[in-house]
């Protein structure tokens, strides 16, 4: 299964890349393909990330939401978009 990772990034700028990378490793070890938006380059304007992230989400079968997802406007939008598309929603 292709799984897109989603969660609050801005609130944990120092650690989100490692947190996402750890989950990516865990899911890949279980045989999944992981679509990881934390691999995008740092430094773009915030309004530039979401169109890229939604395109990445298009390539996935499911979305994985980290525990903090409800505190992120981006993750809220990604969840709604995934549900609209009928993708499976997985919770951390």
Model-derived regions: residue spans:
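Conserved catalytic or regulatory cores that recognize and/or transform ribose-phosphate-containing ligands
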Residues: 1-92
């Amino acid at each position: 299964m292709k799984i897109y990772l989603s969660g609050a990034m801005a609130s944990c700028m120092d650690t989100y890349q490692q947190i996402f990378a750890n989950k990516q490793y865990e899911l890949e070890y279980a045989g999944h393909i992981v679509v990881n938006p934390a691999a995008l380059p740092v430094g773009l304007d915030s309004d530039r990330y979401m169109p890229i992230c939604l395109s990445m989400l298009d390539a996935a079968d499911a979305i994985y939401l980290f525990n903090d997802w409800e505190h992120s406007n981006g993750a809220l939008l990604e969840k709604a978009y995934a549900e609209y598309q009928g993708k499976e929603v997985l919770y951390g």
